[in-house]
Amino acid sequence: ARPEYLMNMEGTRTILNKSYRLPKLIHAKANKLISRIEDRVDKEWTSRDENGQVNIYPVEQLQKMKEGNWLVLARDRYRLDKLEEDLKIYGYFYERGDRTSINKRIHQAILAWEDVRKGKAVDIKAVRSFYNYIVTGRGVSKEFKEMKNVNKEKLYTYDTLVSDYGLSVNKEKPWFDALRNIPLPKATYVRAVLRRKENIKRAPRIKLSTI
């Protein structure tokens, strides 16, 4: 039936003002939603005594964050904790406080390895960052694992590292095959971020902060 037809019918109206099905939290949520409808018959009604539980599934909201820059503000830290968990599940790259969602050391190692295998020369700090995540004895010799007693002012190329500094990982291998010591959950997350075409060389588009 059309709502306006029922609303305009003549007769006696009896309001059922007690719900024996909806708990308190659901009742409050329902009232908040229904209040958005302007042309309606208002009524006062109560819930049952139990509190109940409201679970928010953020998939549709997260879809809106696929593009553009976002600053997400929350009054309570626990709300950001939940959002942060969901952003990680769905592979979003974000920043909270002074840290990004990708571990700093892992982030540096990935970028450094990708630079080296593409022919760029990098400094000793960059070499150490990715050597740390290469399996000793299989991808880099134990002698050079920590790159001690080497020229700290020098720039290093892939060919130089192979010939003189114990590297044996094929440069055709992407970071997730070369840097096998990155913990699997962290590597899986970074790969999910990259599948979203996020640019991890730049600051994250999404920033989380408390008010």
Region annotations inferred by a language model:
Residues P58, A74, T210:
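Pocket-edge structural micro-motifs
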